[in-house]
Amino acid sequence: MLETCYSIRMRAAEKNLEGGEKHISGGERIGSEFQIEPIVKQLLNKARNHSRGDADFIQITVEKLTGDQILYMPPLEITTIDESSIERAHKEARSILTSVGVSKQAQNVAFHLLASNQNLRGAILLHSQTGLRLDNRGLKGVRVSRIDWQDADVGYNERVREALALATKVANSPYTIAELCWSDDPEYVTGYVSNHEIGYVRITPLKREGCESGGRIFFVSDEVELESYIHYLEREPILIRGHLK
């Protein structure tokens, strides 16, 4: 267990003529005092070399944590499904969501939101049955934060490791029914469906190459205590430990 460590977070955006901003990139790491500088350099490089555009605003936050604040959990098990078309991939994702209890109505809302939004900074929380949005945060959404791997050498590439760490934290809340995600990066067409029972199911292609729409949807239960759930997602530090299966 780390006695003292630091949450190191990055957010990058590009200003537009209307006074708003386009989300470019984000990043989350947890490390020791001696790891702060190399992690900051890594996150800056990610922000400055991104396919979504040239960031003219980059924010780095370094926050001290104590070891007793950190929760440890094993990663979700990974499976991969390759489909021949976006239509078939969507059908497969919907089938999985149905199997874990997400209604067709909520699925319709989720797929519409992910296909039509190109500037979501955080996740959208949807009621798993009604499809009603619960977080009321607009494009900001809910940012899952303070997450990393205990061991950096766990296999797979950086993109999959980051997404799996996030999905693992989300799935370990009793209020999460399932997560649906695909990236807003234009070159990346793979997404996933996940929860604590089915694990992390990668599905491709969930969108066409060159498309910048995407984001994350968390389907939540009737029993959700919204303030507690959001606090867990945004504030409680988590380290993922164990080998990928």
Curated annotation (Swiss-Prot):
**Activity regulation:** Inhibited by magnesium above 10 mM and metal chelators such as 1, 10-phenanthroline and EDTA.
What EC numbers are recorded for this enzyme? Answer: 6.2.1.14
* InterPro entries per the UniProt record, alphabetical: BioW
Keyword field: ATP-binding, Biotin biosynthesis, Ligase, Magnesium, Nucleotide-binding
Instruction: Describe the pH dependence.
Output: Optimum pH is between 8.5 and 9.0.
Instruction: Look up the record and give one Gene Ontology term from the biological process aspect.
Output: biotin biosynthetic process
- What cofactor does this one take? Mg(2+)
Would the keyword Zinc be found if you checked this record's keyword annotation?
no
Q: In which pathway does it act?
A: Metabolic intermediate metabolism; pimeloyl-CoA biosynthesis; pimeloyl-CoA from pimelate: step 1/1
Keyword check for tRNA processing, yes or no.
no
Q: What class of enzyme is it?
A: ligase
State the Pfam families in the record. Answer: BioW
GO MF term list: 6-carboxyhexanoate-CoA ligase activity; ATP binding; magnesium ion binding
Per the UniProt entry, the disulfide pairs are none
Catalytic activity, reaction form: heptanedioate + ATP + CoA = 6-carboxyhexanoyl-CoA + AMP + diphosphate
Q: What this chain does, per the record? A: Catalyzes the transformation of pimelate into pimeloyl-CoA with concomitant hydrolysis of ATP to AMP.
Subunit organization: Homodimer.
Output this protein's name: 6-carboxyhexanoate--CoA ligase
Protein's organism? Lysinibacillus sphaericus (Bacillus sphaericus)
Taxonomic lineage is: Bacteria, Bacillati, Bacillota, Bacilli, Bacillales
State the encoding gene.
bioW
